[in-house]
A protein has these predicted regions:
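An acidic/histidine-cluster motif and surrounding catalytic segment
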Residues: 1-85, 89-261
Length: 261
């Protein structure tokens, strides 16, 4: 069985209880990882990482990235795959069975439905998993292999980004998507009119102002432009080599957490 961890701030007791209730209901052994808070990120580390993406990262975003990276280090050290969840992931009843099955050879297996389209490779699906050419968003539920962990850790010092953007940077990891998806973030369910059973406001939701068009900020615009240029071949290949669509999901699986009532 692939071990499973969820990332949770010490002060986020409601989220912890939510994940523990799900684990009990599903018969899933789910361990807690104490997340780094913004206050845990020292100034030196923040300064080294915050300016490496397409806009300046917030201290909260750096803390979330480093929390994920701590579990990537565990994967690399143990030389064994790990399923990693954020504490607002609503889990499918099919998840425990999936974690007991033999794993295909990918760096990352995305377990999540995030309600955004992504690029899938055409003709690269076995009906249960579909190969991803380029993902976009969501790091609430994924399975990482030791090779994937080592690749991610090797890149973090020079290419830091918010956790999902970092994981899904073009060409970094070989990825596939479980279909139908095995997890959905609470805020995604809420947006679709489904009660997720937990509050949907997270520590990531802090205001960010627009980036001023100054000489100091040109590098961020340049990085965004490079990202868009990398997408051009994918868009050109749509319909021939790639499909641009949302992952398949059965939202009826993700009922409210009845054990809280």
């Amino acid at each position: 069985v692939v071990p499973a961890y969820y990332i949770n701030l010490d002060r986020a007791r409601e989220r912890r209880d939510f994940m523990e209730r799900q684990a009990e209901r599903l018969g899933l052994r789910l361990s807690r990882f104490s997340a780094l808070s913004a206050e845990d990120v020292d100034e030196t580390r923040f300064t080294a990482l915050a300016g490496l993406w397409e806009r300046p990262m917030t201290r909260v975003e750096v803390a979330v990235l480093l929390s994920h990276a701590s579990l990537w280090q565990k994967v690399a050290d143990d030389d064994a795959p790990l399923a990693i969840f954020e504490d607002d992931a609503v889990l499918s009843p099919r998840l425990p069975e999936f974690l007991r099955e033999p794993l295909p050879a990918y760096d990352l297996i995305n377990l999540e439905y995030f309600a955004r389209r992504k690029f899938f490779r055409r003709y690269a699906s076995d009906g249960r998993m579909s190969d991803i050419a380029r993902d976009k968003a969501g790091a609430a539920a994924y399975l990482l292999s030791p090779d994937g962990a080592r690749k991610a850790l090797a890149a973090i010092e020079n290419h830091a980004a918010p956790a999902d953007a970092f994981l899904y940077a073009s060409g970094r990891l070989e990825m596939t998507q479980v279909e139908p998806a095995l997890a959905v973030q609470a805020e995604v369910l809420s947006a679709k009119g489904i009660d997720p059973g937990v509050a949907t406001v997270t520590q990531i939701h802090e205001p960010r102002g627009r980036l001023a068009p100054t000489s100091d900020n040109w590098v961020y615009g340049w990085r965004r432009t490079l990202t868009q240029l990398r997408l051009v071949p994918l868009h050109v290949g749509r319909g021939t080599f790639y499909e641009f669509r949302e992952p398949r999901v059965d939202l009826s699986e993700f009922a409210p957490d009845q054990s809280s009532s």
